[in-house]
């Protein structure tokens, strides 16, 4: 420190001596440096000395210069010193100051037309912030920015995105202008990252002590979690002190990951920062190209650089600042521009300019000199130095260095990648050492049983449970690749985790927060609330909300045979049968047909109805209809019956083989609009919180989620919600309920249900994903995420998905119809109604038969005796009449009533053969004959009533016409009987004798 004032005085004297000694030089430049930029002045003088010794550039001309120092925060002083330099006459002005004074010098240079080469400098090595110099659109800006623009915010954003950080804290020192990362803060806020800011005071020890004194234990623990991810924007000296303090006070552990970003970090600073830190450290700094050939490190084209600046082993070169390098390259650039002007013989002499005089004119050669400088370019210590159209240097490169996770101090550091504005990030930031060193590591894994993500595959008493599922397959893939082992257990409360009133977490997330587990895996969705307390890998499967509903069951309709026609149509058909039967009877009654030989049926109303019904069911009828009107009626009826029966047959076949039972709920909107089926989800789950936040949003008051929340929140959520997913699935299967849950879980349940009784609906928008949860700041997250991405890229993840969610499962996921129903075979349920109708007919017929039997027995008890009710023995009468007809004088013979033997006849019983023949029914007729019986006998005649013949089962025939009988004449001919009296022969049934008609083929009658 005692030598420094002497050197300063010596340098000022040397500067004045140089100026006076070269007063006749035509090349003179001025320099303004910050008071703290002593190295800039030293490097500036070294650069001028190197160029004056190089005869190939300026040949016989020498560069002279004037240097002055100003307060970086005093713009007035900077302008005053610049005016003094312009008054001396300069070709260009070089400045290494802060942004405050740079703006004033920019205005002065523009006014006086003096090229101004500005090297931005920050205080004490603190990272730069953008100066924001105003650029004119008229291309009359005489200020050129030698240092590239500030790209720190772009580099930080790229690195943070690569590391997939979601929550971190930024520490910055008191000298840093926080506005320098305002653009970065805006971008991370748009991406949903949680970023905290904290200013680091100069007295770091006092700041740390204050934290311990003012924070409670819970707050201090949360602060420790925050420090696991941190970005340090401060000068190297402050960063070293801060890291030392937090490590010694145990505020950070080996699982922390810090990023230090500063352009001014040199190799010595890197080694010191790595030595003091624990955990993982990433360093971002500006880097410059170095020739691979050691012998060429100090040569740039035809110019040789002083070895004190280019030799990496030189102590001065090791501690140079970024601004020192740009100072040297600026002098080299000016020397080449002067050389160009001398060669082109377009030299403009220097002019003494006065800033004080009102009518002072700018330098006439300023524009030409500025264009020569802008078009030129050199290769120096910083690489290629050139200017773009906007007057800035676009060439910049950043180097990203990093260490591996570890507790030991003094770990090695390696280059992870590099960044530039053109190509972006080149390289991988993955911790390769961590990937290779997980062999033998045993991780404790917490899970929640959820099909098909995690399921118990084997549970043997006395042995650890074995698990299977999609998440277990993913975990095994990571384990096989990285080489770690794991022990798995189920969360004590079987929950995924939600925040409690006291700020703690329960469930799977709570196990990670309290550090009882290293990894949490199941059907765990990535949510902002969970990301605040734990870290997540990249998603390994997309997530969406679905609804599980019970497929509508096929109802057992015993009378499915009646389904093809509507009830009203059946009523019309039944009425039509009655109406047509009545019309047929009336038509035959109005115009009775002639009696046909051999026909023994009559057209009663009963027979007409029976005939119409028989023809309708295609069974035919017994009554012949010969009238034209009746036949036209029956023709129309048969056509009607043909169409109806054909339509019924076709419709019945289609109805019994294909049954469609479609549900009215096919989307979440349909579910929210109805109230017949209650629905809910798992209490305090991610789905529950998602619906709650959406439903309580005032901007979505009438939306789908608000309607869903009203249903889910009934009775404070206890009415329609369940405590775990399996309870919700069982509630759907055995009740009227819809379960809202993860679509992947519900699809697996629907696919593998033995009865195929479920179907799912849902939202296909994958706004979230399933991820592996780790402790906040876990060193394993990055390598896990990298491996998951590799599994997705090579298709292994899709293979695992198809294993648990096959495309062609045994059940249809989205159809509310039972697709397992066969279309060809009909079961007993489909025809149960037909058997019921048959059974009803049998029961009814048996009941009627019993009634008839009872009625006949009751009627038989009241039949009169033989003495009171006798009938004529028709066979005896037949023989007597035949004998009379063969007598010659029978026509004139008189006989008395007593000559006729009235013998009771029993016609109740008939021989078997006789019963099989068609026998006329005389119940509604009587036999009228013309006979020769004397009129005295006719008084005994009476009509054969239906009552008398009730036991004689004859068919119905038309009534015989009354007329005279013919009898055989003695000569064998026939003649009309002289007695033409018409009389009736009465008869009554007798229960004792049978009547044998037609057994004797030789028997005949003339009646």
From Swiss-Prot:
Coiled coil: none annotated. Member of the ionotropic glutamate receptor family, which plays a crucial role in synaptic organization and signal transduction in the central nervous system. Although it shares structural features with ionotropic glutamate receptors, does not bind glutamate as a primary ligand. Promotes synaptogenesis and mediates the D-Serine-dependent long term depression signals and AMPA receptor endocytosis of cerebellar parallel fiber-Purkinje cell (PF-PC) synapses through the NRX1B-CBLN1-GRID2 triad complex. Tetramer; dimer of dimers. Interacts with EML2, MAGI2 (via PDZ domains) and AP4M1. Interacts with BECN1, GOPC, GRID2IP, SHANK1 and SHANK2. Interacts with CBLN2, but not with CBLN4. Interacts with CBLN1 (via C1q domain); the interaction is CBLN1-NRX1 complex formation-dependent; CBLN1-binding is calcium-independent; CBLN1 hexamers anchor GRID2 N-terminal domain dimers to monomeric NRXN1 isoform beta; promotes synaptogenesis and mediates the D-Serine-dependent long term depression signals and AMPA receptor endocytosis. It is linked to Spinocerebellar ataxia, autosomal recessive, 18: A form of spinocerebellar ataxia, a clinically and genetically heterogeneous group of cerebellar disorders. Patients show progressive incoordination of gait and often poor coordination of hands, speech and eye movements, due to degeneration of the cerebellum with variable involvement of the brainstem and spinal cord. SCAR18 features include progressive cerebellar atrophy, delayed psychomotor development, severely impaired gait, ocular movement abnormalities, and intellectual disability. Belongs to the glutamate-gated ion channel (TC 1.A.10.1) family. GRID2 subfamily. Changing residue 349 to A: No effect on CBLN1 interaction. No effect on CBLN1 binding. No effect on synapse assembly. No effect on cerebellar parallel fiber-Purkinje cell synapse formation. This is Glutamate receptor ionotropic, delta-2. The PDZ-binding motif mediates interaction with GOPC. It is found in: Postsynaptic cell membrane. Changing residue 24 to A: Reduces binding to CBLN1. Abolishes CBLN1 binding. Abolishes synapse assembly. Abolishes cerebellar parallel fiber-Purkinje cell synapse formation. Abolishes D-Serine-dependent long term synaptic depression at PF-PC synapses. Pfam families: ANF_receptor, Lig_chan, Lig_chan-Glu_bd. Ca(2+) 2 binds at residues 753, 755, 757. The lineage of its organism: Eukaryota, Metazoa, Chordata, Craniata, Vertebrata. Changing residue 343 to A: No effect on CBLN1 interaction. No effect on CBLN1 binding. No effect on synapse assembly. No effect on cerebellar parallel fiber-Purkinje cell synapse formation. Changing residue 345 to A: Reduces binding to CBLN1. Abolishes CBLN1 binding. Abolishes synapse assembly. Abolishes cerebellar parallel fiber-Purkinje cell synapse formation. Abolishes D-Serine-dependent long term synaptic depression at PF-PC synapses. Residues 24-345 are annotated as: Interaction with CBLN1 homotrimer. The modification Phosphothreonine is found at residue 886. It comes from Homo sapiens (Human). Glycans are attached at residues 293, 426, 713, 716. The gene is GRID2.
């Amino acid at each position: 420190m005692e030598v420094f004032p002497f050197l300063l005085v010596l340098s000022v004297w040397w500067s004045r001596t140089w100026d006076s000694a070269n007063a006749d030089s035509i090349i003179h430049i001025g320099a303004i440096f910050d008071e703290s930029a002593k190295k800039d002045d030293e490097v500036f003088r070294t650069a001028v000395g190197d160029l004056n010794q190089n005869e190939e550039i300026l040949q016989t001309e020498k560069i002279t210069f004037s240097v002055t120092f100003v307060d970086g925060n005093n713009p007035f002083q900077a302008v005053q010193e610049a005016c003094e330099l312009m008054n001396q006459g300069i070709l260009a002005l070089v400045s290494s100051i802060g942004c405050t004074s740079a703006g004033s010098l920019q205005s002065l240079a523009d006014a006086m037309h003096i090229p101004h080469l500005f090297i931005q400098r920050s205080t004490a090595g603190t990272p730069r912030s953008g100066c924001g110099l105003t650029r004119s659109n008229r291309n009359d800006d005489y200020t050129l920015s030698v240092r590239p623009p500030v790209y720190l915010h772009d580099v930080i954003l790229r690195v943070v995105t690569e590391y997939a950080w979601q929550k971190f804290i930024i520490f910055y020192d008191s000298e840093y202008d926080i506005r320098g990362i305002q653009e970065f803060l805006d971008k991370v806020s748009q991406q949903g990252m949680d970023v905290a800011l904290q200013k680091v005071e100069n007295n770091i020890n006092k700041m740390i002590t204050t934290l311990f004194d003012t924070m409670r234990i819970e707050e201090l623990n949360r602060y420790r979690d925050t420090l696991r991810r941190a970005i340090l924007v401060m000068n190297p000296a402050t960063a070293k002190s801060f890291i030392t303090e937090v490590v010694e006070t145990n505020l950070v552990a080996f699982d922390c990951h810090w990023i230090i970003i500063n352009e001014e970090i040199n190799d010595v600073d890197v080694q010191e920062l790595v030595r003091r830190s624990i955990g993982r450290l990433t360093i971002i700094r500006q880097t410059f190209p170095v020739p691979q050939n050691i012998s060429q490190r100090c040569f740039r084209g035809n110019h040789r650089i002083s070895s004190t600046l280019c030799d990496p082993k030189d102590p001065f070169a090791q501690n140079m600042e970024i601004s020192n390098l740009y100072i040297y390259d600026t002098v080299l650039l000016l020397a080449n521009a002067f050389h160009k002007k001398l060669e082109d013989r377009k030299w403009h002499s220097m002019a003494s300019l006065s800033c004080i005089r009102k009518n002072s004119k700018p330098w006439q050669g300023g524009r030409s000199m500025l264009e020569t400088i802008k078009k030129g370019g050199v290769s120096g210590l910083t690489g290629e130095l050139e200017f773009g159209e906007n007057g800035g240097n676009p060439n910049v490169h950043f180097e990203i260095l990093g260490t591996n996770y570890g507790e030991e101090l003094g770990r090695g550091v390696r280059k992870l990648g590099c960044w530039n504005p053109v190509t972006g990030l080149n390289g991988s930031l993955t911790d390769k050492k961590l990937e290779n060193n997980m062999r033998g590591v045993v991780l404790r894994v917490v899970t929640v049983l959820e099909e098909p993500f995690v399921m118990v595959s084997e549970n043997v008493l006395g042995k650890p449970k074995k698990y299977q599922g999609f998440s277990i397959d993913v975990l095994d893939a990571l384990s096989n690749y990285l080489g770690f082992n794991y022990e798995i257990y189920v969360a004590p409360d079987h929950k995924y985790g939600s925040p409690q009133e006291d700020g703690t977490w329960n469930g799977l997330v709570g196990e990670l927060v309290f550090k009882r587990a290293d990894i949490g895996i199941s059907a765990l969705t990535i949510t902002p609330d969970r990301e605040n307390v734990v870290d997540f890998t990249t998603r390994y499967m997309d997530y969406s909300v679905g609804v599980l509903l019970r497929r509508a069951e096929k109802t057992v309709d015993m009378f499915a045979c009646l389904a093809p026609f509507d009830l009203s149509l059946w009523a019309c058909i039944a009425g039509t049968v009655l109406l047509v039967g009545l019309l047929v009877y009336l038509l035959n009654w109005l115009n009775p047909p002639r009696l046909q030989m051999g026909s023994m049926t009559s057209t009663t109303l009963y027979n007409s109805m029976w005939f119409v019904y028989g023809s309708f069911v295609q069974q035919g009828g017994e009554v012949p209809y010969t009238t034209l009107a009746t036949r036209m009626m029956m023709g129309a009826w048969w056509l009607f019956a043909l169409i109806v029966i054909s339509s019924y047959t076709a419709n019945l076949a289609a109805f019994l083989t294909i049954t469609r039972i479609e549900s009215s709920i096919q989307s979440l909107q349909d579910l929210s609009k109805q109230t017949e089926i209650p629905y809910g989800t798992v209490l305090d789950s991610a789905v529950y919180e998602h619906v709650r936040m959406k439903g309580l949003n005032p901007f979505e008051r009438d939306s789908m989620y608000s309607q869903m929340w009203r249903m889910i929140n009934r009775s404070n959520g206890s009415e329609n919600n369940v405590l775990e997913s399996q309870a919700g699935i069982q509630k759907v299967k055995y009740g009227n309920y819809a379960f809202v849950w993860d679509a992947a879980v519900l699809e697996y349940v629907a696919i593998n249900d033995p009865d195929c009784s479920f179907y799912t609906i849902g939202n296909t928008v994958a706004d979230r994903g399933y991820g592996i949860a780790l402790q906040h700041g876990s060193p394993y997250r990055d390598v896990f995420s990298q491996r998951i991405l590799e599994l997705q890229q090579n298709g292994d993840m899709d293979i695992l998905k198809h294993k648990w969610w096959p495309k062609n499962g045994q059940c249809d996921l989205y159809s509310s119809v039972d697709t397992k129903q066969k279309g060809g075979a009909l079961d007993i349920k489909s025809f149960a109604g037909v058997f019921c109708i048959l059974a009803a007919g049998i029961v009814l017929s048996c009941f009627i038969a019993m009634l008839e039997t009872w009625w006949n027995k009751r009627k038989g008890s009241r039949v009169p005796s033989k003495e009171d009710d006798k009938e004529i023995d028709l066979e005896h009468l037949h023989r007597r009449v035949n004998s009379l007809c063969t007598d010659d004088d029978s026509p004139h013979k008189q006989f008395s009533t007593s000559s006729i033997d009235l013998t009771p006849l029993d016609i109740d019983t008939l021989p078997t053969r006789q019963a099989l023949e068609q026998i006329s029914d005389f119940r509604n007729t009587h036999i009228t004959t013309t006979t020769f019986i004397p009129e005295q006998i006719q008084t005994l005649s009476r009509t054969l009533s239906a009552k008398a013949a009730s036991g004689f089962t004859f068919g119905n025939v038309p009534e015989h016409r009354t007329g005279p009988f013919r009898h055989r004449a003695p000569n064998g001919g026939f003649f009309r009987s002289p007695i033409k009296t018409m009389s009736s022969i009465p008869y009554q049934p007798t229960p004792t004798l049978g009547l044998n008609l037609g057994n004797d083929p030789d028997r005949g009658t003339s009646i």
